A protein has these predicted regions:
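Active-site neighborhood of thiol-dependent amide/isopeptide-bond enzymes
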Residues: 118-171
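N-terminal accessory/pre-domain segments preceding catalytic cores
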Residues: 1-133, 138
Length: 171
């Protein structure tokens, strides 16, 4: 079944071609959706990620990791009263993707969603954005460093981060 994650047929075709090229490059071993029971939209979103994510992410993390994160994106959109109002393009390019910088990928999306959902579920989209910004400020303060960008959970644990780490944490 055709999903509605990408409603523009021309863009969907371009993405599908890019996805097919990526899988041809890395091999089907690195894209295994068997037993994941994806919906059509989840499958299309996962293909979108694979079409454009860094090749190292494809080979370093199992398909199930990205599928779980895709599901969380759709879960948040469904459970938040304003989720349906997030424009398709913004949802596709700024909610579904996991990577922000060169940070290690972790389970931060699940951890943060569980911590934030009750805090924002009764707010307008505008107020939810502000509340999440306040939450980020409560958890992490700016501190310069020369090290590799820390993962969102590492930034949470240390409660400090550079501007890139703060943006990675916020997203």
């Amino acid at each position: 079944a055709q999903g509605t994650f990408i409603s523009n047929a021309a863009y969907r075709t371009t993405m599908q071609q890019q996805f097919n090229e990526r899988i041809k490059t890395v091999g089907k071993t690195f894209y295994n959706t068997r037993n994941l029971n994806l919906t059509a939209d989840e499958n299309q979103a996962l293909e979108f990620l694979y079409a454009y994510m860094p090749l190292a992410d494809i080979t370093d993390y199992p398909t199930s990791f990205f599928a779980d994160n895709v599901r969380l994106s759709f879960q948040a959109r469904k459970e938040m009263p304003w989720g349906k109002d997030v424009p398709e393009l913004l949802f596709r390019h700024f909610v579904v993707p996991i990577r922000v910088n060169n940070e290690a990928l972790d389970s931060s999306r699940s951890v943060f969603y569980n911590e934030l959902k009750n805090r924002v579920k009764h707010l307008s989209m505008h107020d939810a954005i502000l509340e999440i910004n306040h939450w980020c400020h409560e958890k992490v303060t700016y501190q310069p460093s020369d090290a590799r960008t820390s993962s969102p959970l590492q930034t949470l644990r240390t409660a400090t981060g550079r501007c890139g780490e703060e943006s990675t944490f916020a997203v």
